[in-house]
Amino acid sequence: LNVPYFHLVFTLPHDLNPICLQHPRIMYSLLFRTAWQTVKTFASEPKFLGAKTGMTAVLHTWGQNLSLHPHVHCIVPGGGLTAGGKWKTTRSDGKYLFPKSAMRIVFRGKFMAALKDLAKSKTIVLPNELKKKLYRKQWVVYAKRPFAKPENVIECVSCFGHRQKRPAVSLLALSPAFTGGTRKHVGHLVFGDGVF
């Protein structure tokens, strides 16, 4: 779409690495889901957008130094569809889609609520000390300024697969998952109330 796009990155605290190693499918699915819920929550607020938006997300499980560093890169259009089906552009000041500090708090709250539910159902073990530590931490939600033009989104998505055997551009074909090289990436395209 010929609209502005924003780049968001949601990162899990390293304190969760042991649980990510024990339950990668559960934890990474939860990361996608809560990142999307956070974006959807802010987009639905009239003071920010008041519309249904979309999101393309790519999981990176490793950092540049190849240490475990789970985070999702998200490309979010600078607008969405109103209840009447009309396109509405974001009220952003042009720097960031939504306030970073508020997104951090909402993301942490949504992730922790889901994590506690998993612990309650005995799907994972979440010690009380770890839970307290996670609530005290300032979680990382990184927001980049919007792309200069929509064509830059393709360049950005291709960078997500840097040094991969298969290019990340395969996400444009809605490939549900791919692996290559030393890192694993899983992509999802979500619009409206899509399910991961």
Regions found by a protein language model. Name each.
Residues 1-196:
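Beta->alpha loop/short-helix hinge microenvironment recognizer with preference
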